[in-house]
Amino acid sequence: MFNEPTTYYLIKGILQAENDSKQRLGQKFAESLRLKPGPSGPDDGVDGSTCFLGRKIHFQSKLSANFLSKDEARKYYSDIKYHMADISIMLAGVGYKETFLDRLFGHPDINSVVIHLLTLQDLFERSNKFQNALKDLPTLENLDNILRFP
């Protein structure tokens, strides 16, 4: 349930966009976070990265209109390990299936990585999950600025 009807329509509009538009939005998010952007096109599992307080941070945006499944969790875990992240922030369009969570957190070494699984709703409504992620990457505060209207 959305706290504000406007949030629903903003998210709906984003999720109905073409894939290249959603990819550009993910890159805009990374840019707004002052992260080193991932490559255009196939992004090698990273939309942005940086080091903050000596910890390597990985940011990935998957703005799918569907809940992310275990297949996405497999890719995400692999990307976290490949990029040697200490902290990883995933921004999903609508959320995560239980199978995603089971698969991701079923890896015995995953607890060594701080993971923040956010949604567009978390971003727009500045949820508790969003507030917790701010502690690890204060520039997350900038994300909603690219979506605000004057």
PLM regions and their residue ranges:
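Mixed-charge (Asp/Glu-Lys/Arg
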Residues: 1-150
